[in-house]
Amino acid sequence: MDDTNQFMVSVAKIDAGMAILLTPSFHIIEFPSVLLPNDATAGSIIDISVHHNKEEEIARETAFDDVQKEIFETYGQKLPSPPVLKLKNATQTSIVLEWDPLQLSTARLKSLCLYRNNVRVLNISNPMTTHNAKLSGLSLDTEYDFSLVLDTTAGTFPSKHITIKTLRMIDLTGIQVCVGNMVPNEMEALQKCIERIHARPIQTSVRIDTTHFICSSTGGPEYEKAKAANIPILGLDYLLKCESEGRLVNVSGFYIENRASYNANASINSVEAAQNAAPNLNATTEQPKNTAEVAQGAASAKAPQQTTQQGTQNSANAEPSSSASVPAEAPETEAEQSIDVSSDIGLRSDSSKPNEAPTSSENIKADQPENSTKQENPEEDMQIKDAEEHSNLESTPAAQQTSEVEANNHQEKPSSLPAVEQINVNEENNTPETEGLEDEKEENNTAAESLINQEETTSGEAVTKSTVESSANEEEAEPNEIIEENAVKSLLNQEGPATNEEVEKNNANSENANGLTDEKIIEAPLDTKENSDDDKPSPAAAEDIGTNGAIEEIPQVSEVLEPEKAHTTNLQLNALDKEEDLNITTVKQSSEPTADDNLIPNKEAEIIQSSDEFESVNID
């Protein structure tokens, strides 16, 4: 109690929870009102004493120290252990790492990461249950530095760094084999092979470090695990191949699945072959009959070819061998000549085909002496060229029609009578019909002249312009055109219809010209509805006709009629041609009017080249 202090104070004011006390020296003291006596009011004088309680103080300090020691012993002495990283397996391109279970003590885990060359490459998921990791895609024969870092609430704890080097291709110690369904003999061979190549011990279950799954047949739980883990499923021959070559080989040709599918396909093919064996035996027994029939058909098909070849060869041998000798007689008609040459060409093309039996003509040639040399025949070469031209002309539809007409004419005409005499006989029988049709032609000519007169009245100015242009064109015309115009004018000066004698003479000349110029007429295109207004005879065809003396050359003049009127006149003339059943050739040069000038030439409107007369209309 010696340490007790006692003093007297007076209460100045009492508020809620707080009292103001005054000391004798007039110091103000704030004192809790709860500690005042219950009957104390403002102005009351009270005594206050204070002392130090050391015993209680020591007891409390001792209790506090005990609690601190207990906490330290529980949470402060056992820290988390750093992870221990180890190598499980290393191959040419992969490394498998493993570590011991983590010792965290009382700390909580934050993360577990794997570092390669001080770079984080993998964050381990479920670190409390996962104790290994596999890194693939590494380089051959290369060193790598790995470490595992543990992060907890008690701090960060890294593992020791380990250096691992990948294997070379000739190092087979990294092979880790897991076996599946194995035949006992193959299992023994596998164990011996593993010992010879110093590979890792054989596993019976698929693990993270398994590199190859070896089995004799597919199926089983371990087979499915290996398939899910993308582990190559191979046969025993793969390890034997690696052992024989002393290096790691490619696995593409040793998959057990491909081998199983091959065996299945082979079994299926064997079954199908066995099923098809019986029908094939029956077919072979019936084969001689079929071959005999085929041989008979082939012999019958080749018989006509042999006869034609013999005929052509005999005709060729009959011809003179020297070019200076007199040539043989030509065929009666050009059509017959083209047929003979084309057949000869067909025989040559057939003889050039391989793998065909030699014909009788070839046997005859083989019997001839080797010293005999065949000389060139110019007449035969000309026949071949004509046949080629004739075949090219026959490819067009127009030429095909004309060739059919010519063939019919040659069949109907007797070869002993000349063409001109036969035409005259036919025309003498048809003279009454031609006399009746001349009146209809004159009516058509009068209708055409009336149309021309109507157009002259409406287009006077255009006629003057066209006369100037036609005069300029006449100055530039060639001498051949001037001669042709003079021939037209001489024909225009003739008056009155032609007599029967002239008609018969012209028909005879036209038929003779048609017979002599079959090939020229074939070259001329047929008139159709589309090109009837624009067709023009080629100058070459006109010159050929003039040289033969059958029909005189008619000049080409412009058309004065409008397109519609000209078309109507052409239709009328075509109708007359069909009724007369005569060969009429319409020669017309059409000029379409342009926007700049209404071209109405001051020339002949239309000239009709016929086998019985030449008609024309002259416009001044």
Curated annotation (Swiss-Prot):
The lineage of its organism: Eukaryota, Fungi, Dikarya, Ascomycota, Taphrinomycotina. Keywords: Golgi apparatus. Residues 79-169 form the Fibronectin type-III domain. It is found in: Golgi apparatus. This is Cell fusion protein cfr1. Residues 315-330, 424-434 have a biased composition (Low complexity). Coiled coil: none annotated. GO terms for biological process: conjugation with cellular fusion; Golgi to endosome transport; Golgi to plasma membrane transport; Golgi to vacuole transport; intracellular calcium ion homeostasis; intracellular potassium ion homeostasis. One of its GO terms (molecular function) is protein-macromolecule adaptor activity. Residues 287-566, 588-620 are annotated as: Disordered. It comes from Schizosaccharomyces pombe (strain 972 / ATCC 24843) (Fission yeast). Residues 472-484 have a biased composition (Acidic residues). The keyword Cytoplasm does not apply. Its main location: Golgi.
